Each structure stands twice: as C-alpha cells, then as structure tokens.
Amino acid sequence: MKKSINLRSLAAQAIEQVVEKGQSLSTVLPPLQHKVSDKDKALLQELCFGVLRTLSQLEWLINKLMSRPMTGKQRTIHYLIMVGLYQLLYTRIPPHAALAETVEGAVAIKRMQFKGLINGVLRQFQRQQDELLAEFSGQDARWLHPMWLLNRFQTAWPREWQAVVEANNERPPMWLRVNRQHHSRDEWLKLLEENGMTGHIHPRYPDAVRLDAPAPVSALPGFEQGWVTVQDASAQGCVELLAPQNGETILDLCAAPGGKTTHILEAAPQASVMAVDVDAQRISRVYENLKRLKMKADVKVGDGRFPSTWCGETQFDRILLDAPCSATGVIRRHPDIKWLRRDSDINELAQLQSEILDAIWPHLKPGGTLLYATCSVLPEENSEQIRAFLSRTPDAQLDGTGSTQTPGIQNLPGATEGDGFFYAKLIKK
C-alpha cells in the first residue's frame, strides 16, 4: 500500500504548505513521512529540504520556462515542477525516472490534465539547461536567499556575508553529544567504530562528535539508552559557558525540545533544574528527552515575560535563556526559515527578547550567572540587545564574553563547523 504513494506529489504538497500557508517544514513533513515506507522517508525529506534550500533558483527557472504562472488550485503543479527541476539539477536520480515519477505526481493529486505540461517544461529545461544556468549565475537569486535577508547579512557582516550565505546553503553536518555520565567521548567513538561508523571530535566542545556520514539515530550505539543525543556543536556551547554545578538551582528558559536541559543534567546531575517553555506542544519533547536519558526536571509551560506565574518569587543560581529568535544561524538545518521569516519579524523578536530579559533578571540570585543565547546572526537580537540591557541594568555585568561595545561571542554558521550561535554571559553584581 505504501509503495503506491507518489513521493513527488507529497513533496509538492509539503512545499506548498510551507511557502503558501506559512507552515514550518518540521510540522508538515512528519505526517507525510508516516505515509511512506522507511526506505522512501529519506528521499521525501531530501526533496522537501532541497527544494526549499534552492527555492529562489527554481522559481527563477520556472519564470523562464513558463509564460504564465500557475495560480489558485493549480499551485500544487507549480511546486511539482519545482520538485522535478530539483531532481534534474541536484540528485543522482536518472533523468528519465525523475521525469516519469514527477509526471505521475499529477495523477496522484488528480490533475491528470497537467501531465503534458509538466513533461514539456522539464524536457525544455533539459534542452536549455546550460544557457539557463549561465544566465542565472548573474542573478541576485543565485544566493538562494530573499533580498531583505541578504541585505541584513550584508549590513551586519560586510566582509563575512558571502561565507554566511554559502554556509546556509550547505547540507548540515550531524553533530552528537556524548553523555559523560555513561561514557567518555573517546570510549563512545570506539563503540561507533565497532559499529562500522566513524566520526571526529570538536576542538572546543568536550562532548561533541561529528559523524563523518549522517546516520539514523537507531544505528547509533546506545541512543535509546541515553548514551548520546543529536545536538549541534554550537548549541553544546551554551552549557559549556553556563558551567552548571551540582547542588545549584538552575532555570532553562525557552527549553523545548530539551537538548540543553538534559545537557545541564549531564554536566551537573545533582543540580535542581526547572525547564520552562511557552509552547505546550513542544514541551512534550522535553519530557521525551528526559525519559530517554532517565533524568528528572521540573517541567512547566510558561511565558518568559511573566515568570511569577510559574515560579513565584524563586531565584536561581544560573539561568540559561535560549531566547526566541529569527533562527538565521540555523538556516542550513531549516531552509524553510528563509521563506517563513519577514523583515518586520526582527524588530518584533528583539522587543520580545528585551521583555524576557527584563522580566527574568530579578529571578537571578546576586552573584548568579545568566547565559543569553540565540541561534541568530543578526546584531539586533544579539550584541545590540545585550548592550542595551547592560545600559539599563546597573547590577548586570559581562563575564568574559566580548566587550561592553561589542558584547557577546558570535559564531557564524560553518565557521566552527557548528551552526550560527550567539552567547553573552552576564553576572548579577
């Protein structure tokens, strides 16, 4: 039964939901993957991620190949053609198979009358591919980012913006975090090799291992037993800087899906940890991660702007605030971000971050540490945010992360093999 489902039509429908309806791929894709065989799940993911990674190129090509855009209920055909173009450009699928399966996608979504159109457009691309790609190489769309975001990168990083964009357009590496409560990193690497896989360590983060070739978690030694967790190297930097200690009371704010909560408990198993997130659906992932790693934390649904509603007057020794942000540092992992975000979102997010910082600061004990982190590369959410906070908060000071003028540490995507991340470590006087 599962074999008869046309993957190209599923991919086209998923991409349409993202681009036209503003749904995130992480919401749209899993239900569709349940419809297909395990063997086909990876290809469905590749088609969806790949089209969203290269969307501006595929859009440009369709505009060149078609005299009129598909509108209304026929938009799914537009995205089906994109799926076909992506296969011809970026996969090893034989062209005849890519064409045949994409054309059959029209049958799967009951648009048989468009089979000839899809076939004609894709064959026209094959004939004109070299000249079309030569012309495309001079277009702004070649950067595969919306112009508003490209402009922000160029303003924020006049020397590095091109490297940032190129890193965003790459496939992400698969980083793991070894649970030091079970094995040292070197011990687990030996187990990995015994299972026919290889990886290498990160020079800065002591628990991080990068797989030389991505693998399903079911193949990782001890994954179900909690020996290892999938987490990018840059995200692991949060707990390294937070430096949690046994016996402390620690708050992980904006905690879902729980990767940093469990990392805190791996580093300080005798700490008392509260994990809070505003999203009741995503908080279930925190419970899942705690259960797999056999850990306990006080998990709550709560808004970071109103901490008294979920922690009363409690003060914490350490607070990790992984603030809601534009996620512009993790585009290589979530290419839909490029098309879901809007320029106006940035100021709105900066305002939200500011409100959370001001609200949570009174809940940090004197002498305590707050680590502010984002997976953004935009100064408005990062260094400018912290500079403004320091200027209005007399009892806050930086602790070894940057200077007063440019507070914090900014990792750009790919620069340390990890995602784009920002950290600022603050001490309450």
Curated annotation (Swiss-Prot):
Binding sites annotated in the UniProt record for S-adenosyl-L-methionine: 254-260, 277, 303, 322
Subcellular locations according to the entry: Cytoplasm
Alphabetical list of InterPro entries matching this protein: MeTrfase_RsmB-F_NOP2_cat, MeTrfase_RsmB-F_NOP2_dom, NusB-like_sf, NusB_RsmB_TIM44, RCMT, rRNA_ssu_MeTfrase_B, rRNA_ssu_MeTfrase_B_ent, RsmB-like_ferredoxin
Pfam families linked to this entry: Methyltr_RsmB-F, NusB, RsmF-B_ferredox
One GO CC term, this protein: cytosol
Keyword annotations from UniProtKB, A to Z: Cytoplasm, Methyltransferase, RNA-binding, rRNA processing, S-adenosyl-L-methionine, Transferase
Catalytic reaction list: cytidine(967) in 16S rRNA + S-adenosyl-L-methionine = 5-methylcytidine(967) in 16S rRNA + S-adenosyl-L-homocysteine + H(+)
Active-site residues annotated for this sequence: 375
MF-aspect GO terms: RNA binding; rRNA (cytosine-C5-)-methyltransferase activity
Family to which the UniProt record says this protein belongs: Belongs to the class I-like SAM-binding methyltransferase superfamily. RsmB/NOP family.
Role, per record: Specifically methylates the cytosine at position 967 (m5C967) of 16S rRNA.
NCBIfam families: PRK10901.1, PRK14902.1, rsmB
Name of the featured protein: Ribosomal RNA small subunit methyltransferase B
Gene behind this protein: rsmB
